[in-house]
Amino acid sequence: QAPLRVIMGNPPYSIGQKSANDNAQNQYYPLLDGRISDTYAKYTDANNKNSLHDSYIKAFRWSTDRLGKEGGVIGFITNSGWLDTNACSGFRKCLEQEFSSIYVFNLRGAVRGKKGELAKKEGKNVFDIMTGVSITILVKKPCDKTKATIYYHDIGNYLSREEKFRIIKSFGSIASPAINWKVLTPNEHGDWLNLRSELFTTYPVFGDKEDKKNKQTVFVPYYSNGLKTQRDGWAYNASLKIVKDTAKSQIDYYNQQREGIKRGEIEEVDYSTKAISWTTAVLADISRGKEYRFADTEFRTVCYRPFCKQNVLYYKPLNERTYQMPKLFPAKESQNKIICVSGLGGGVPFSCLISDIIVDLNCLSAGAQCFPLYWYDDSTADIADLFNQVPNINPMDRYIRRDGVSDWILRECKQRYGNKVTREDIFYYVYGILHSPEYRTTFEADLKKMLPRLPLVDTPEQFMAFSQGGRKLADLHLNYETVEPYAGVTIKTSGTPNYEVQKMRFGKLDSKTADKTKIIYNPHITIENIPVEAYEYVVNGKSAIEWAMERYQVTVDKASGIKNDP
């Protein structure tokens, strides 16, 4: 007989503070974080590897290293996000290499970011959290060099918390014959669930930041994430006046704190304040003594959520990340169109939406990625300024407009579909393909794990059909505020018409069932005879109507205390 090392626990699920105002920075452990970099991160293809330093992932790494060559058993109940995210592909690969047997009991309950039926399908959580939960048993035999056999069981759909507890209790052990273990066969990408298609990888990728010469990409490398303010309650509002007033008060408060620190009157900024959001970048600026100037601020209209525009403070010191947006929309006068797609690993099915203004990062699930028709080159801006020392000059004269659609894909499409094909035709072809139900269904798993890729159809007629369809969709999605209203809808009013709205609601068929053919705008106005087909077009988990109902209501931001009344 030999000693058996067993490590069991319920590690913390959180990666750390929600904002710098929490003043609860993540703990850094040099040796442990170094081990994660040398193992899990090394074998992960994703660019953003932050989640690999989550506390529960650190617990896996620490425990694995404690077992050593002698082996043993690890039993954890943790966040289940690692099972299918792109960022954790290297983590899964390492588990497969470092253990002999792996048992995963998925308790589901991952409702964060999910909407409607997708959220209901997850069932209730076994804890009072919105993050999915799984039980993982890792078995390591001494000196075993073979890859692990991976056993997986999903507890099921639509279950209550009590039903899940009963199932767990009835199983009792991973050795129970009642558990119908499924043996998983990972692919080369480290996918355990929802394996991506090999066919998908044969298509041209939308973009590749490493492919500077655009040898085989649809777009040049100037695609971008959406704008990340990290202070939405302070930065966004339907009222331009409120945005400007808030910007000035934030800058004044920041400079007052900066001066106080400089004079030695303040040792540390006030993290509890509602006057400003203390993000990483702002704290770095104040530590350097950098001054903020209201005179340098700019204000833009932004697509904040699908079919919902807001005013925003567009000022780099108070925008945590602008990414490549300044190259896509360098000035208010910029003319451009961008196709925005869901980020990787989102909680709702893939979506896309076209925009002709800046887009917020969270306009689409998991961080919108935006692919432009054009990008603007400012490399000669200083020279242009020398010749434009006159008042009222067009700000866009400082920039040279470049094509966002690559030369490579233009050549490919001309060879396949004829010399008359233009970059605009390709741009709208992309939008048409992305709306194809067959494309979304066939490559559902791929679109959660990778940037979109572009199938090229067989004939010129098929190409133009998708291109023209994409162009028509783009026109509807960009100009939705000016399209002809649906003739069958009726608007009923009572008393003196009053267009103030607190919160729109659906009518009721009975106490539990909404009547989506009727919207109660406010106590005086009701919209009726809405065709149910209007709800079939879904972006980011909701129909366009439901986005309007959700966003066009009076809200008060909890963090800042600022009222937003669209």
Positions of predicted regions on the chain:
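Sequence-level detector for compositionally biased, low-complexity segments
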Residues: N21, Y28, A46, W62-P566
